[in-house]
From Swiss-Prot:
Name listed for the protein in its UniProt record: Metal transporter Nramp5
Keyword annotations of the record: Ion transport, Iron, Iron transport, Membrane, Transmembrane, Transmembrane helix, Transport
Any single GO BP term: iron ion transport
Ranges for region Disordered: 1-53
Any one Gene Ontology molecular-function term assigned to this protein's record: metal ion transmembrane transporter activity
Compositionally skewed regions (Polar residues) per UniProt: 1-10
Biased composition (Basic and acidic residues): 11-27
GO cellular component annotations of the record: membrane
Function according to Swiss-Prot or TrEMBL: Seems to be involved in iron uptake.
Protein family: Belongs to the NRAMP (TC 2.A.55) family.
Residue ranges of the TM segments: 65-85, 98-118, 147-167, 179-199, 207-227, 253-273, 299-319, 341-361, 387-407, 429-449, 458-478, 485-505
InterPro entries documented for this protein: NRAMP_fam
Coarse class of the protein's main subcellular location: membrane
Length: 530
């Protein structure tokens, strides 16, 4: 250890060796310090996994890597990865393959890496503070901004949920050979809110086990389709390695990038990581947890990338350059596959339906889970989990039922609806990403785990790029859809308010003095300096 480091450590105030409650008070703005009993409640014990086998040991550096411990940390990243595999993403994949062939696979890879960066920052804020993003927003922003952020998050979640529930309903319709109409599928799917409540009571590992089965089902289904259709491996690798973007594929490219950041997923991941018991007072333990979550999340998104690649390649092989390419969508994709590749021992239509059902069910359950954290975090509501799940589910099921009944027989109408829902979710991205980057780069919130200048610049660059891509999509959509002076005037007024709120969020900084400032230097010593 260098002499200057020792000097800083000796002259700096010692980190408080106090109770967990007092430590949490350091993380809350001084002007809004809650009483001990008002601090957020920890999850029930059966939802927290103890990962510290050697909790009695004291480490001067990050504990050594352990495969057994990595296994214990495995779970939250795979739940997070579901948002990269929802029916909206699957539809984006199939349309990208049908319209652009293999040429956008490089963009799919880089978009997944950008999404990984944002999710790692979400995990970082959850582990380092012991609170999830919605809770931190509640304590940091003024009431009006907090309520508006909650509303935006709920709107994005409802939009995503409608897509996911309809995706599951379409899958059920396929698997029952049209016997179940879409609206009946919506009713069946709505009961998963009670399933998640039951699995939560059984333990976090049971819930994670369900998602492991659903992800494996998707992987096997779409891998089987990939093997059955035999896409060109050479063209596939060229598409991954060589960037190529034609004027006719810009819309599909925007769709690929726009799907990588799902607003509710940013809030969800910061809460999921708290299912592993990590003491925020132990700097080395926190760093250890972040290391394991980085490995686990990277592995999870590698799996999601491969599943998305399988779907894109299957439709690139079957429909690129055909007359069906411009009309293919989630509703008719299975029938196009059946017409193209026939039946066989395992008809491809049903394999597609099974994969789509797994995608829809897994994403609706994670959406319900995210809704609980968003509502309880922003509004500080304490209620039974089943009731919270039911309320959250109702926000989405009621409009979804209306949509399913209205558009049950019209494939074209469902495609138009899906386009509107993509626009709705794209509009909400800034209201998840900007608070995340603001908080994770704030020393008052993060202490020694505040991200450095280089990572902060990279994160903001990625965020601005994704928001610009979605801004292009919004502009293109509204220019095509908005007609008339009155409608145009109302849209203009909405855009002004929308941009004003974004500017407020970007320029916002906590006015509270840092509770960590006097402690940072003493904690900046890590194992590499010894």
């Amino acid at each position: 250890m260098t002499g200057s480091t020792v000097s800083r450590q000796e002259n700096s105030p010692k980190r408080p060796n106090d109770s967990n409650g007092e430590f949490k008070r350091l993380l809350v703005p001084e002007t809004s310090q809650p009483e001990e009993d008002e601090l957020h409640e920890s999850p029930p014990e059966n939802q927290i996994l103890n990962v510290e086998e050697d909790r009695d040991k004291t480490y001067d550096s990050v504990p050594p890597f352990s495969w057994a411990k990595l296994w214990k940390f495995t779970g939250p990243g795979f739940l997070m990865s579901i948002a990269f595999l929802d029916p909206g993403n699957i539809e984006g994949d199939l349309q990208a393959g049908a319209v652009a062939g293999y040429s956008l696979l490089w963009l799919l890879l880089w978009a997944t890496l950008m999404g990984l960066l944002m999710q790692l920052l979400s995990a970082r804020i959850g582990v380092a503070t012991g609170r999830h993003l919605a809770e931190i927003c509640r304590s940091e922003y003024p009431s009006w901004a907090r309520i508006l952020l909650w509303f935006m998050a709920e709107v994005a979640l409802i939009g995503a949920d409608i897509q996911e529930v309809i995706g599951s309903a379409i899958a059920l319709q396929i698997l029952t050979r049209g016997f179940l109409p879409i609206w009946v599928g919506v009713i069946i799917t709505s009961f998963d809110c009670f399933l998640i409540s039951y699995l939560e009571k059984c333990g976090m590992r049971k819930l994670e086990g369900l998602f492991a089965v659903l992800i494996a089902t998707m992987a096997l289904s779409f891998a089987w389709m990939f093997n059955e259709t035999k896409p060109s491996v050479e063209e596939l690798f060229i598409g991954i390695i060589i960037p190529k973007l034609g004027s006719k594929t810009i819309r599909e490219a925007v769709g690929v990038v726009g799907c990588v950041i799902t607003p509710h997923n940013v809030f969800l991941h910061s809460a999921l990581v708290q299912s592993r018991k990590t003491d925020p007072k132990e700097i080395n333990r926190v760093q250890e947890a972040l290391n394991y979550y980085t490995i686990e999340s990277s592995a999870a998104l590698f799996v999601s990338f491969m599943i998305n690649l399988f779907v894109t390649a299957v439709f690139a092989k079957g429909f690129y350059g055909t007359k069906q390419a411009d009309s293919i969508g989630l509703v008719n994709a299975g029938y196009y596959l059946q017409e193209k590749y026939g039946g066989g021992v395992f008809p491809i239509l049903y394999i597609w339906g099974i994969g789509l059902l797994a995608a829809g069910q897994s994403s609706t359950i994670t959406g319900t889970y995210a809704g609980q954290f968003i509502m309880e975090g922003f509004l500080d509501l304490q209620m039974e989990q089943w009731l919270s799940a039911f309320i959250t589910r109702s926000f989405a099921i009621v409009p979804t039922m209306f949509v399913a009944i209205m558009f049950n027989t019209s494939e074209g109408s469902l495609d138009v609806l899906n386009e509107w829902l993509n626009i709705l979710q794209s509009m909400q991205i800034p209201f998840a990403v900007i608070p995340l980057l603001t908080m994770v780069s704030n020393e008052h919130i993060m202490g020694v785990f505040k991200i450095g200048p280089s990572l902060e610049k990279l994160a903001w660059t990625v965020a601005v790029f994704v928001m610009m891509i979605n801004g292009y999509l919004l502009l293109d959509f509204f220019m095509a859809e908005v007609e008339g002076f009155l409608v145009g005037f109302l849209v203009f007024g909405g855009v002004v308010g929308y941009i004003s709120f974004i500017i407020y969020l970007v320029s916002y900084r906590s006015s509270q003095s840092s509770s960590w400032s006097s402690l940072e230097m003493s904690e900046r010593v890590v194992s590499t300096e010894t």
